[in-house]
Regions:
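Glycine/threonine-rich beta-strand-loop-alpha-helix active-site module
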Residues: 530-617
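ATP/NTP phosphate-donor binding region
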Residues: 459-546
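C-terminal segments
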Residues: 2-23, 42, 90, 282-287, ...
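A glycine- and small-aliphatic-rich helix-loop capping segment at beta-alpha/alpha-beta transitions
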Residues: 133-139, 199, 216-220, 236-238, ...
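N-terminal Rossmann-like NAD(P)+-binding subdomain of aldehyde/semialdehyde dehydrogenases
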Residues: 2-108, 136, 278
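ALDH superfamily catalytic-core signature
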Residues: 5-6, 13-15, 131, 209-339
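Rossmann-like NAD(P) dinucleotide-binding subdomain of oxidoreductase/dehydrogenase enzymes
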Residues: 98-239
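Short, well-ordered beta-strand elements within core beta-sheets of diverse protein domains
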Residues: 25-35, 118-119, 261-264, 349-360, ...
Length: 619
């Protein structure tokens, strides 16, 4: 059945036909960009960034006027960020053809477009998100079709038009950037699910993101945030409070990475509160708390009241029937805890901040976790502290993909201002937030990377002792070996019975130094683990610096096992016995000897044990 939505009172739009046309044109543009060079792509994207930057102020004005939300100056900054910071970050990215080649490994990587992108944008950051998504899409030779939030349709479309016209003037195909002109839920759904769309790049509420992931195609959807900020007792209070105000008041708190609650250690709670109050932050009185909660939250939907999103603190106070001083930047609600029973501990997307007192770091961590579990899993968590060990502990504990330290969260979370994270206006929340990405989304997420692998035969190997002496009378080398003070001689009973052990002993006694000698002569044919362990015990008791294996393969194999366990008592027989296909990749690594020399003196030829690293032990 054909779905229709009203365009005007007397005109309807065939949604199916409209989306078909957009997708068809986009795929024509995709084909046209197949043969673009990296230089062509970079020129196009640079011109787009320049055009957006040139119009950052008019676009900000349009966004504020159309949506009735946010702050003009801050939206202008966001538009500049989406143009300047994003371009600066991606301008050197290789996104066309061969992007990496390694002659040694024989591997070559080739970048290909993912295909036509469906870009869904929010009302909170409409123009900046449109600019951002357009830049990373065209940088990767992917046409993009937008579904704008209905309450920000005009300003978003103008942002798209500006970068589209600049792209076309620079050589891009005509329909490289398009958008739905009559927005509706049906149209957005039809676009996301259209077979001509390759991937969905969605920014918005949890419901919309869930829809993006339900299309059966790749999606880069990112969820909401409910960001906790912990001010620990060692923090620099003035800086921490300033960071909170800078972040929470920016664009009236509409960046999803902005703080939603501040948790403060009891030792500094009073000083933090005083610092807030000194900077035009209003603390709601106990008898005003319910009024604020009723105005800000829609508990029927367990979410913020859309009417207050992006409004000023003064406007929200007025809606709540609370009298505040002129110039109030932020409204703070002091809460006993975080969770469903404290509605103001949810995401508020406005200059309304919850504040809680923590008894210690563990209590603070628990409150932060409660915040994240209330709709903020995977997004962002902040800690202000001078304790570096606590910074690490916080990072290990919090289920958030951005852990910010001593940083304004809104400006820190989007990256590249207060840190070296990837700059982005689409922030992944990982599996915590049911997202496919955990990092800040950028151009790297919009390319397919093909790997060309040339044939390389595995290197073959064999291992020999560092020194091999042969010919008659080679045994005399024992007289000249360095660092020989205590010798453990390992052999079978026959070597003692027939005098071969004495021959070795006499050579050692010809040395200038006095050599202590201990003999283990209980090696049987095909030695067992019990024999190896018995010899190892003797070594541990005697503490030799040199081990001499005398005899056939059995004696040498047993001596190798004893040597290994003597050198590294924590070696596991179970691991050491495992087979391997490639010695460089063996699952169980045997540590190298560090304190003992090892000498093999074969009395037979055949096993080759004296020149191999292998040892045959019967279990």
């Amino acid at each position: 059945m054909v779905k229709t939505v009203k365009k005007e009172k007397t005109e309807t739009v065939d949604v199916s036909s409209m989306i078909d046309e957009l997708a068809t044109k986009a795929n024509v543009a995709l084909k046209a960009m197949e043969d673009f060079t990296q230089e062509q792509v970079d020129h196009i994207v640079h011109q787009m960034a320049m055009a957006a930057l040139d119009q950052h102020m008019p676009l900000a004005k349009m966004a504020v006027e159309e949506t009735g939300r946010g702050i003009y100056e801050d939206k202008a900054i966001k538009n500049m960020y989406a143009s300047e910071y994003i371009w600066n970050n991606i301008k050197h990215d290789k996104t066309v053809g061969v992007i990496n080649k390694d002659e040694q490994t024989g591997l070559m990587e080739i970048a290909e477009p993912v295909g036509v992108v469906c870009g869904v944008t929010p009302t909170t950051n409409p123009t900046s998100t449109t600019i951002f998504k357009s830049l990373i899409a065209l940088k990767t030779r992917n046409p993009i079709v937008f579904a704008f939030h209905p309450s920000a349709q005009k300003c978003s479309a103008e942002a798209a038009r500006i970068v589209r016209d600049a792209a076309i003037a620079a050589g891009a195909p005509e329909n490289c950037i398009q958008w739905i002109e009559q927005p509706s839920i049906d149209a957005t759904s039809a676009l996301m699910n259209h077979p001509g769309i390759a991937i969905v790049l969605a920014t918005g509420g949890a419901g919309m993101v869930k829809s993006a992931y339900s299309t059966g195609k790749p999606a880069l959807g990112v969820g909401p945030g409910n960001v906790p900020a912990y001010i620990e007792k060692t923090a620099k209070v003035k800086r921490a409070v300033n960071d909170l105000i800078v972040s929470k008041s920016f664009d009236n708190g509409m960046i999803c990475a902005s703080e939603q609650a501040v948790i403060v250690d009891k030792e500094i709670y009073a000083s933090v509160k005083a610092e807030f109050e000194a900077h035009n932050v209003y603390f709601v009185k106990p008898n005003e708390l319910q009024k604020l909660e009723d105005a800000v939250m829609n508990e029927g939907k367990y979410a913020v009241n859309p009417a207050i999103v992006g409004n000023s603190a003064e406007k929200i106070a007025e809606l709540a029937g609370i009298s505040v001083p002129k110039g109030t930047k932020i409204l703070v609600a002091e809460l006993e805890g975080a969770g469903p029973e404290y509605p103001l501990s949810r995401e508020k997307l406005s200059p309304v901040l919850a504040m809680m007192k923590s008894n210690n770091a563990e209590h603070a961590f628990e409150l932060c976790e409660a915040m994240l579990n209330l709709g903020g899993l995977g997004h962002t968590a902040v800690i202000h502290t001078e304790d570096e060990e606590l910074q690490v502990a916080f990072g290990l504990r919090m289920k958030a993909c951005r852990i910010l330290v001593n940083t304004p969260s809104a400006e820190g979370g989007i990256g590249n201002i207060y840190n070296e994270m990837i700059p982005s206006l689409t922030l992944g929340c990982g599996s915590y937030g049911k997202n496919s990405v955990s990092k800040n989304v950028s151009s790297i997420n919009l390319i397919n990377i093909k790997t060309v692998a040339k044939r390389r035969n595995n290197m073959q190997w064999f291992k020999l002792p560092p020194k091999i002496f042969f010919e008659k009378n080679s045994l005399q080398y024992l007289q000249k070996m360095e660092n020989v003070e205590r010798v453990m001689l390992v052999c079978d009973p026959g070597m003692v019975q027939f005098g071969y052990a004495d021959i070795v002993r006499k050579e050692l006694q010809k040395r200038k130094n006095d050599v202590k000698i201990e003999v283990f002569s209980d090696v049987e044919p095909n030695p067992s683990t019990n024999t190896v362990y018995a010899g190892t015990k003797m070594m541990v008791d005697f503490q030799p610096d040199t081990v001499i294996a005398l005899g056939g393969g059995s004696a040498m194999d047993a001596a190798k096992g004893m040597w290994m366990f003597y050198e590294h008592p924590d070696t596991e027989f179970f691991g050491a016995k495992q087979k391997f296909l490639d010695i460089r990749k063996r699952t169980y690594k045997i540590a190298k000897p560090e304190k003992t020399q090892f000498v093999c003196i074969p009395t037979t030829s055949g096993t080759g044990s004296e020149v191999t690293p292998l040892s045959l032990i019967h279990i």
